[in-house]
Amino acid sequence: FENLSGPKVASPKWAAPVKLKADDKIFRVMAGVNGSIQGPAEAKWGYTTLSISDWDGDGLPDIIYNSILGKVEWLKNIGTRTSPRLTKSQPIEVDWQGPALKPAWNWWNPTEKQLVTQWRTTPVVFDMNQDGMPDLCMLDTEGYFVFFERSIKDGKRILLPPVRVFCDPAGKPLRFNDRIAGASGRRKITLCDWNGDGETDLLLNSSNADLYLGLGKKEGKWLFEKKGTLAKQNIEGHDVSPTTVDFDGDGVADFLGGAEDGRFYWMKNPRSK
């Protein structure tokens, strides 16, 4: 959906949707007959959830996504910022120090460096340690919110194995889903500075989105305190997918959520003037 209004317009006008293509073919994830943990009735479903970031450091925004399959992959942009062209999907690779991890209920095994985790949960691409390289933050195979750090090895960017360094104020690792199989995953997440204090906060799907205020880093762990939902209105069907935008250009992150009814919901940040 192209924004036709330009910057600093609180209620933009949008162009008609255009289907994304990867390797010149319409991009669509489908489970196929055995790709969904909930069975073949979902053969044509995709459950895609994504982040936009310059994953490879070439100055162009790429797409990093998860889906019904639990395979975290990316679409490299080989076009321009105004006319993107996407390559075919390729796996996000982890420099595992042993066998690649997978959910216990998966009937198939990942390849040597492949990143496989719980389905239907956002791969949040964010430079958490502020070293200039985007990291990956998302649920691991057991539902904990974990940190995949980017690093350099032999002159190339790599992704290190996950560590559970996102915790509550008591230092207990954040676990956003302890259920298994079809009930696993299903958590939509974004990271931002919601209250403007310079610390990274977290928004997690709920009736709209739950706010976890960042308390900073202590003894190697990032601490977050749950503060409740952003608003009273319930827009949830299954999951609300939260992100932040600044349509009006005031420098303050506002809430944008995609809901199961197919609509986008926008809410102005309370600290915005």
Model-predicted segments: where are they?
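A structural feature that tracks compact, well-ordered secondary-structure segments
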Residues: 1-3, 53, 66, 75-77, ...
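Active-site proximal loops enriched in glycine and acidic residues that flank catalytic Cys/His/Asp
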Residues: 67, 76, 138-140, 149, ...
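Blade-level signature of beta-propeller repeat domains, shared across WD40, Kelch, NHL, RCC1
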Residues: 238-273
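Hydrophobic strand positions within the blades of repeat-based beta-sheet folds
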Residues: 50, 63, 74-77, 123, ...
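Blade-edge motifs of beta-propeller repeat domains
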Residues: 4-45, 78-118, 151-184, 215-241, ...
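Acidic/hydrophobic-patterned starts of short beta strands in beta-sheet-rich repeat architectures
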Residues: 57-67, 130-139, 196-205, 249-258
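Loop/turn residues immediately N-terminal
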Residues: 70-71, 143-144, 208-211, 262-263
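Beta-propeller blade termini
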Residues: 48-55, 120-128, 177-178, 186-194, ...
